[in-house]
Amino acid sequence: MGDVKLFASSHMSKTSHSVDPSKVSSMPLTEAPAFILPPRNLCVKEGATAKFEGRVRGYPEPQVTWHRKGQAITNGGRFLLDCGVRGTFSLVIHTVREEDKGKYTCEASNGSGARQVTVELTVEGNSMKKRDQPVLSKASGFPGETRPSIWGECPPKFATKLGRAVVKEGQMWRFSCKITGRPPPQVTWLKGNVPLQPSARVSMSEKNGMQILEIRGVTRDDLGVYTCMVVNGSGKASMSAELSIPGLDNASRLAVRGTKAPSPDIRKEVTNGVSKDPETVAESKNCPSPQRSGSSARATNSHLKSPQEPKPKLCEDAPRKVPQSSILQKSTSTITLQALKVQPEARVPAIGSFSPGEDRKSLAAPQQATLPTRQSSLGGSVGNKFVTGNIPRESQRESTFPRFESQPQSQEVTEGQTVKFICEVSGIPKPDVGWFLEGIPVRRREGITEVYEDGVSHHLCLLRARTRDSRKYSCTASNSLGQVSCSWSLLVDRPNLAQTAPSFSSVLKDSVVIEGQDFVLRCSVQGTPAPRVTWLLNGQPIQFAHSICEAGVAELHIQDALPEDRGTYTCLAENAMGQVSCSATVTVQEKKGEGEREHRLSPARSKPIAPIFLQGLSDLKVMDGSQVTMTVQVSGNPPPEVIWLHDGNEIQESEDFHFEQKGGWHSLCIQEVFPEDTGTYTCEAWNSAGEVRTRAVLTVQEPHDGTQPWFISKPRSVTATLGQSVLISCAIAGDPFPTVHWLRDGRALSKDSGHFELLQNEDVFTLVLKNVQPWHAGQYEILLKNRVGECSCQVSLMLHNSPSRAPPRGREPASCEGLCGGGGVGAHGDGDRHGTLRPCWPARGQGWPEEEDGEDVRGLLKRRVETRLHTEEAIRQQEVGQLDFRDLLGKKVSTKTVSEDDLKDIPAEQMDFRANLQRQVKPKTISEEERKVHSPQQVDFRSVLAKKGTPKTPVPEKAPPKAATPDFRSVLGGKKKSPSENGGNSAEVLNVKAGESPTPAGDAQAIGALKPVGNAKPAETPKPIGNAKPTETLKPVGNTKPAETLKPIANAQPSGSLKPVTNAQPAEPQKPVGNAKSAETSKPAGKEEVKEVKNDVNCKKGQVGATGNEKRPESQGSAPVFKEKLQDVHVAEGEKLLLQCQVISDPPATVTWSLNGKTLKTTKFIVLAQEGSRFSVSIEKALPEDRGLYKCVAKNSAGQAECSCQVTVDDAQTSENTKAPEMKSRRPKSSLPPVLGTESDATVKKKPAPKTPTKAAMPPQIIQFPEDQKVRAGEPVELFGKVAGTQPITCKWMKFRKQIQESEHIKVENGESGSKLTILAARQEHCGCYTLVVENKLGSRQAQVNLTVVDKPDPPAGTPCASDIRSSSLTLSWYGSSYDGGSAVQSYNVEIWDTEDKVWKELATCRSTSFNVQDLLPDREYKFRVRAVNVYGTSEPSQESELTAVGEKPEEPKDEVEVSDDDEKEPEVDYRTVTVNTEQKVSDVYDIEERLGSGKFGQVFRLVEKKTGKIWAGKFFKAYSAKEKDNIRQEISIMNCLHHPKLVQCVDAFEEKANIVMVLEIVSGGELFERIIDEDFELTERECIKYMRQISEGVEYIHKQGIVHLDLKPENIMCVNKTGTRIKLIDFGLARRLENAGSLKVLFGTPEFVAPEVINYEPIGYATDMWSIGVICYILVSGLSPFMGDNDNETLANVTSATWDFDDEAFDEISDDAKDFISNLLKKDMKNRLDCTQCLQHPWLMKDTKNMEAKKLSKDRMKKYMARRKWQKTGNAVRAIGRLSSMAMISGLSGRKSSTGSPTSPINAEKLESEDDVSQAFLEAVAEEKPHVKPYFSKTIRDLEVVEGSAARFDCKIEGYPDPEVVWFKDDQSIRESRHFQIDYDEDGNCSLIISDVCGDDDAKYTCKAVNSLGEATCTAELIVETMEEGEGEEGGEEEEEEEE
C-alpha cells in the first residue's frame, strides 16, 4: 500500500494526515528510505527560529521534501531547506509566526519507495495567559495537554478492510486485515464490546503483517459484529465486520445487529502529542467533555448544547437506521464521526462503554443533530481529529460524502507498456475527481496521458510508461460535503535488453554545397542502451548548429553555409559498451560577388546567441587534501565570459584556485581542498544575448577518528518565578571531548553580563541564572561541538509572576486561576496558611516538562500519563536500537562515557538540579562507622516546600515571604554541617534510625500514596518531629477520575501554606516538620486506603476539586474485576520474569503496577504491556532487586480492584557472609535489595577509615607512574615511580628482563617514596619498555612505561639495485629503512652521481621504494644512493649502488630481489620438510644482516646461508609460554604441507630458549597493493586477471591439503620482485586444518575481509577464504572497499548485512565477466560461493591475457584506499573480533561485561564449553605477544564529589598479562552488577564503575581490585554525595538562618 491521506474539510478548515507508505517491490541493490534520526516536534517562541532536522538513509540517496497543509514547502523567504551529507536534512523557519504552527510532513523518497514522518510546530505567544480569565477543566483519563512527542509518529491505520462474512453453520471462517502505524500498534479483537479470548475454536494470529481472526465450526452463537481494535501511543483505530449465516430470520438478525456497532466502520482517535480542541473528537475511551481545553471551551458549549436534552446525554453508537456522515479511506475503511450531545460541565461517558440494553433504549430516540456542518466554532479542529454533524435524514438522502468504491492499485511495469489506473467514486452531489503526480495535477497530453470518465469509473492512462514515471500518484474525490483521497505507486523497470556497442547502419556521405545554402548530414546508428551522439568539425565540437537524434537517425542541420563551414564532419556515437564514429567531407563553394557575400554574412555572423552549457557541473564528494577540477563546456555568440562563485561569492584566481580555458571548455582547479571548501559552486556564463549558470555541491569529507558529541543526560525546561535562581544542567560526552556553547534565542550568552555563571564538574555542565528577570525567559540552546560533529538540545525558561495574596479562610476563590486542562499544579503558587489552594498552571501550549520517571510528580494534581509517556519512550528505544550496531560483536565502544543505549533509560532526574535550588548541603552528621551500622533511612526532601523560618504563630493576612537567592557555589560545593546547625525546626529530618517510617503530610494514602521505601516494617509507628500538629489533611478531589489522583506535597506544613512546586519530586517517605504535632499515625505502606480528609482544597465545581458539601455524581458502569489474577513466581537470576493478569471493567480501567510499594514504569529492563484486557510486566533478565511484592491496581470511575503476587529471584551466586538485607536496602529513590556481598580477604585500602585498627603490613604499591613517553633524540628523560607499602622496599628498573645499571648516560635514584630513572640524552637504543619492580617481604609489584625516541630515520637498508636497464633508462629499487625514527617514512630522496661530473646531485623525490630513472646518457656510468625522510628529518644516505651504464644489462646477481620477472616460467623451488632445530643457533648456519621489517609477531632479518650464499628471510619470534611455542610449531607444520610455487616456503627453523626463528624464502617485491600504486606500474584488467589467477591457484592448493588460510588480505599477498606480476601468499599463522576438525568456529579475522559466518560465530569452511578473495578482487579492480566503514564496528555491521553494489563509476570500465566473478564470491550463504576450481574455470580468469584489450584503470581510488587503510590500522596486523575472559568469576562478578545480547555475538559464554575452549579462543584472538605481568593500574580512580540524583563514574585503566579479572568494592563489600551499579571493562583495559541515580547511601569509599594468576592490584577513591535541602531567605538576599529555637 502506498501513501494514504485522510482529508477532513469544511468551509472553515482542512486537515490531513499521512501514513507511512509501505515499500514497493524494489529493484536489486536498492534500499527504500528509512529515517535514522527522525525530525522532532518543536515548541518555540514567536519570533524565534525553528529548525527541524534529521537524517535519512536509502539507496539511491533519498530526496527529502516538506509539506504543510498538502502544499510543498519551497526554499525562499523565511523557509530554508537544506540537505547535507550522509542523509542529513533540515527545515529552518526564521522569525516564526503564529500562523506557522501546525503539522509538517517530511517525505523521503527514491526509486525504491518513500517514507513519511509528521512533526508538529507549537508557537508560544509572547504574553502569558490572563490570570483572571475563567477557565474550565474536566477530569479525564487523558491529559488535557501534554508536551508533543519528540519523535514523529504515525497513528494506527488499516491498510486493508474487513469484509462482511456470510458463512454456513459448522464451517470455518477467517477475518483478516493489515495495519500500519508507529510504534507498532497493539491489536485486540472484540465481539460486540467484549474482547475475544483464544480457545479451541477461536484463534488470533499475525502472519506477514496481516492480523487474522479464525473461528472454527461457526454456530449461531457466533453471529454478530467483530471488531479489530488497534492502539499505539499516537492514537487508535478500529474496524468492524459482521458475521452472518444465510437463511437466518431477518428479524433476529436485525435484533442482533441492532445491539452492535454498524459495519464496517473505523473509529479513530488520534492524539498526536497535543490535544487542542477536544470538542472535535469523534470518539474516545473516556469520552471527554468540551471543557477539556482551556479558554475556547466555553464558547464551544453553546454550539454543543442540545435543547431537547435537559440532562447530560451519553455519547453512544448511533443505531443503524440513523444516517451517519462518514469519511472513507483507502480499502473503503470508514471513519465514523458522530455529533456530541453534551451539556456544559457535564460528564460524558465513552462510546462503546454501554450494555446492549442501553443501546436498545437509544433506538427509540434517534439523535437529532443540532450542530450545523458549517458551524464556525469548529474551525479549531486540530491534527487528525475530524468532526461532522449528524445531518437530518431528509437532507442526508440528498447528499452523501464522497467515497471510493474501488481504488487504483500500485503497479510494476516494464518501460514502454501502457498503464491504466481505474477508480470508482460515489457521492451526492457527484464528486469531482482529480489525479495527481507527486501532488501536481495530471492533465491530458496528446499521445502521452489520457484522463477520461466512463460512467462511474474514472481512468488515468499512461500510453507509454517511462522510467521517470516511477512516482507516487494520488486521486481525490470531493463534493460540497468534503474530500477523500487515496494514493499508490508506479514502478517502471527498464527491460533487460542485451547491451550492444554502437554501430552505424548507414554512414555520412561527402557533399558539396553552395555558400548560403542549408544542408543536412544524416546517418543511422544503433546500440543498446541508445548511444549518445556528438558532432565534430575538424575534430572540434560544433558550437552553432542544430542536431537531433530520433529513432536511431542522427541529423546535423547547418543553415546558411559559409566557407568556414567546410571541413571534415564526424558523428561520434558512444554508450557504456563502447564508441564508434563516421566522417564525411563537406565542401562549400563560394559565391562570386564578394561584396554581396560580406553584406549577407555580416548579419548572420553578428546574430547573437545566448550561452548554453554543453556540459554542466555535477556534485562531487572528495576527501580532505584531494585535488579537484570542475569543468564546463559553454557555447554562445559572441563567446561568453565566465566567472566562478563559491556560496555566492566570486572566486578570485590565486595560488589555491586556478582558472583554465581551452576553446569553449572552462575549468576551475583547486590544488588541495580543505573542509572549508565545502559548498555550492556556480559557474555563470554571459554575453550580450543572455546569461546562464550551472551549479553543483562540493563536499569535502574528513577522515575523523572519534565519537560525535551527545548528551548523557539532557537538560529540561524550567518554569520559575521572578527573583528566583535557576539551574539548567546537562551531562555530555564525545571523543574528543566537545566544546560547549550556550545560546539564548539563537544568540550566544555574553559572559560580561554577570547575570549568569557557568559551572563544570567533569562531564556535567551547569548554567546558573541568579535573580531571574523577565529578559532571562526564552529558548536556551546547548550546542556541543567536536571535530567529528555537533549536537544540540533546546530547553525553555518560562516565568510566572508571583500570585497575589490568598482569599480569607473558608471562602472559595472566584475561579481557579490559570488552570489549563493539562492537569498539574504550577510551581510557585502561594496559598494562605489555612491550606486554601491557589494553583498556578502553565499557559496554554506550554505544557509540562516531559518526565521520564513515573515517580517524579511535578505538582499537586499532575495527571497520570504513564501509558502515554512509556509509549514514547519505547519508540525512542526501539528506533535508536534498530540502528545501533555497537554491540554487534559484544564490543564496548571505547568512550569514557556510558553507552548511549544504557543512558536512554537513566532517568533525566539524575542530572536535574532544578528541584534542589533552595537547599543547603545535607549535614554529614555521624561517623562512617555509625553510618555503616545504622544504615539510616535517608529521606528525599526534593518536594519540600515548608520554609525554615516560618513564624510560630503565622498571621492569616500576611502572605509568606519570598525565597531569597541562595549562593549556588555553596549549594554545589558547600561544607557539611553538624546536627546542631540544623535544629529541630529544620525543613528536613536526617539520619532517621533504621526501622522508623516517616509520617506523610496528612493521611492521603491511596491518593498520593506516600509509602516508606525499602524494607521499613509496616507495623512501626512513624515518629512526628518537633511540635507538628497536622490539623488538616489533603482531601480526595470530587468528580476526579482515579487516573489523576492527588499527589500530596511531602513535608508540606498542613497548618501553614501549601506551595505546590513544578519540580517537586515526592513519592518518598516524608515527615511533617515545623510547628506541628502528629494527630495520628500513618497507615502501613502498601495498604491503598482512601481516607476522607478535611482540608480546604477548594476549586470551582466540576474542576480540580470539590468541597465536602458538594455531591459527587453517581459513577457509571461497573468496577474492575480481575478475571485472571497474578500468581506467585519463582525464577533464577538471569531468567525472564513474566507476570500477567486480566481485568474486566466498564469503562476501561487505568492499571498501575508497583513493586514493594514503588510505582513501576516501562524502562529498558522492565516492559509494561497491555493486550486488550490482559496486562503484563516482563523483565528479560531478572535480578535479585526484582524480587518482592508486585501489585496491580485497576481503577475506573466506578471503583478499583487490586491483586498481588510474590516474586522470588534466586541469586546466581549467594555469598555466605551477605549481611542482613535491612542493612543496605533503605536507600531513598530505590527499591534495590542488597547488592553488596563480602569477600573473605580484607580489601587493602589506600586511605583507611579514621577509626580502623592499626594499619596492617602492606605489600608494595606503585601509586604514581608516568604514561608512555615520546621524546626527540638528544633530549633528557625522567621516569619517576611513586611507591607505598611497608618498608623496606627495594626498587629496580628493568629493560628487556635485564636490570638497568647506572652509566654515564643513565642515572637511577632510589628513595623511600619511590625511584627515578634519568636518561641524560635519549638515543635510539634507549627505546623500549622500562619496568619498575618494587619488592618488600610481603610481595612485589611492577609497572611498565614505553619510551619512544623519535629521530630522523635510519638510511635505507642494503644497496640500491638497478634493473630493467634500457637504452636511456633503468629502474632503481631499494629497501626501506630498518628503523623509521619513530615516525612513518614519508618519502625517499634519490641522488645520482656520474663519471663525468663526479658530484652527488638530488635526482627526484618519491614515495615508493622504486623509481624509473629517465634520460640517462650512454657515454657515462652512474651510481645512485637514497635518503629516507620523515617528519623529524632526512636520513643519512644509503650505501651506493654499483656503477651502472645504460644500453647494457648487468650481470645478474644471485639475490632474487634483483631478478627480473618472467611470467611464463616459475623458477625451481627448493621444497623442504622442516623440523625445529634445537641443537644449533641460527647464527651457526646463517649470517644475520639488516632488519627488513617488524610486526606484532617479532622481527624479520635478512639471512645469508653460509654454505651456499643464498639469501633468505628470518622471522624471529618471542615465545615465552608453551602455548605460544605450540602455536608457532603448528604454523611450521602447516607450511610443511604447502609446497607450491604460489606459497612462500619455510626452509629451516631454530629454537633457543624463548626465541624461535623460521627461515623463509625471500619475497622482495613488497605488498601487492603497494606495487600497484607505484608510479611505474600500469594497472589494467589484464593484470588483475593475472593476480587473481595466481591467488586462486595458491588457495586451491591450500584447500586440497585440508587447510583454510583464514587471513587472506592484501598485506598477505607479496610480489616476488618489483618488475613482474608473480606473487606469493604468506603468513599462515591463523591457518587451521579442517579435516577431522568437526564443526570449526573461529573468533578472529580482519574486519574488512572476514566472512559473515565468522562474525556470526557459525561453522566455517573452505568457502570462508573465498569470501576474502571476492573482497580482494573487488578492491583490486575498483580501488573501492565494499564493506569498509568509519570504524571496525561499522565495517562488521556492513559485512553481516552483506549488501554491496557495482554502482560506482569505478565499475564503468570493468567487464561484466569480472563483475560476475565477484558476485559469485560475495554470497552471504557460503554454500553458494564458487570454490577455487570453479574460479579458475570462470570465463573471466580463462581470458587470453596476451591478446585481450588492455584498458588502463585509474589508480587514484586505490591510492586513497591505501591511505585510508593505513590511517585505520591500529598497528596489529590482525584485530581480534572477540575478547574472552580467561578466569573464573570473583564474588559472582564477571570480569568483563559480556555482550548485551546481540543474537550474532560469539562472545556469549555458553558457546565455550571448557577451559580449553577459552584458552583456544584467547589464542585465536591473537593478542599481542608479551611477557606475563602482574596487574597494575596505569590510571587510578579518583575521588568524586557529585550532587544527589546525578550519575557518578569511576574510571581506571588496568594493565597486566594474562588479562586481569576485576572486582569492585563499596567500603569492605564486593559490588554485584545491577541496574544501580554498572561495570564496563573494555579490551584496552579501561574499566569503569557507573553509579546511576546517586543517593546519600552511595557516599562511601570504592575500591577496584584486579587479579590474575601472577598477583593482584587495587586502587581506592571516595565518593562524596551532596544532598540538597530547602533553604529560606528574606527578600533582598539575606543569609539563610542556621539555627532556630
Curated annotation (Swiss-Prot):
The chemistry this enzyme catalyses reads:
L-seryl-[myosin light chain] + ATP = O-phospho-L-seryl-[myosin light chain] + ADP + H(+); L-threonyl-[myosin light chain] + ATP = O-phospho-L-threonyl-[myosin light chain] + ADP + H(+)
On this chain, the residues bearing Phosphoserine are 295, 333, 355, 935, 1460, 1781-1782, 1794-1795, 1798, 1801
Which positions are catalytic residues?
1607 (proton acceptor)
Q: Where is the Fibronectin type-III domain?
A: 1356-1449
Subcellular localization, per the record? Cytoplasm; Cell projection, Lamellipodium; Cleavage furrow; Cytoplasm, Cytoskeleton, Stress fiber
Tissue/organ expression: Smooth muscle isoform is expressed in all tissues with highest levels in bladder, uterus, vas deferens, colon, ileum, and tracheae. Isoform 1 is expressed in lung, bladder, and vas deferens. Telokin is expressed in smooth muscle cells of the gut, reproductive tract and urinary tract, including in uterus, vas deferens, bladder, colon, kidney, ureter and ovary. Telokin is also detected in the trachea.
Q: Which SUPFAM superfamilies match?
A: Fibronectin type III, Immunoglobulin, Protein kinase-like (PK-like)
The SS bond pairs are: 177-228, 423-475, 523-571, 730-793, 1141-1192, 1852-1904
Q: Region annotation Calmodulin-binding: residue ranges?
A: 936-951, 1733-1796
Requisite cofactors: Mg(2+); Ca(2+)
Composition bias (Polar residues) maps to 286-305, 1052-1065, 1792-1803
Annotated residues for binding of ATP: 1492-1500, 1515
Q: Name one GO cellular component term.
A: lamellipodium
Biological role stated in the UniProt entry: Calcium/calmodulin-dependent myosin light chain kinase implicated in smooth muscle contraction via phosphorylation of myosin light chains (MLC). Also regulates actin-myosin interaction through a non-kinase activity. Phosphorylates PTK2B/PYK2 and myosin light-chains. Involved in the inflammatory response (e.g. apoptosis, vascular permeability, leukocyte diapedesis), cell motility and morphology, airway hyperreactivity and other activities relevant to asthma. Required for tonic airway smooth muscle contraction that is necessary for physiological and asthmatic airway resistance.
The name this protein carries in UniProt is Myosin light chain kinase, smooth muscle
Question: Upper taxonomic classification of the species?
Answer: Eukaryota, Metazoa, Chordata, Craniata, Vertebrata
